[in-house]
Structures are given as structure tokens and as C-alpha cells.
Amino acid sequence: MEFEIIFYKDSKGDNPIEEFLLELGRSNKVLTAKTRQGIAKLKNRAYHKEPLSKHLGSDLWELRIRAGNDILRIVYTFSRGRIVILLHVFIKKKQKTPANELEIARKRLKEIKIKEAN
């Protein structure tokens, strides 16, 4: 069985992950293609374990994509049933994941949990 992939949308209906990937496609087609492949594999459960995916603690995981020297991360969570919600995407430039990038994902996860509770 496949997972359903949902892209986070903000309160205005904007889709920052899809917007990021569209912009990335203009500058780095290889990384964009690998990212789309990674999302497809996540849908089919092929990326739910290391080294391609890593649990970040709490309800957050990261999908790890690399193309040459470029490293991209998508932070995601699991929701009811077989749903994966992509919360945040960024280009990783240092060894350690920046705290501000994780904070964005945590904030979006909190928004989703509040919506699901209502």
C-alpha cells in the first residue's frame, strides 16, 4: 500500500514546498529530479529508513537528497492512516541541520496538529 503525500499549505493556501521546488528546478534540474524521485520513493515506503530518511525526534523525519555537492532536506511527518505531510524543504550547507530550519518545521507541525484536533 502506498502513502499519500501532502504538501504543507499555509493559512493563505500557499504551498512553500512546491514553490521552492519550482524555483530549484530553474537552477538545479538534477537536484530537483532527484528530489521528485525521493518523494515518489517516500510514497512507496522505500525511503522510510536510514540512510535515505532519518528520524529527527518527536514526530519529525527528514528525507535526505544529494546531487553532487548539493544536499537537500525535506522535513516531514506522518498523519492519520497512511499520510505523509511534507512540512519544510531547504538546501543544507553545513554538517549540522540549522535550528531555524527545524523550528519552521516544528511550527508547521503544530499548526497541523491544531487543525486536526478541531
Briefly describe each language-model feature range.
Residues 74:
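Portal/gating segments that form or line small-molecule/metal binding sites
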Residues 77:
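Conserved Hanks-type protein kinase catalytic core
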Residues 1-71, 80-83, 91-118:
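Basic, Lys/Arg-enriched alpha-helical interface segments
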Residues 87:
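ATP-dependent carboxylate-activation loops
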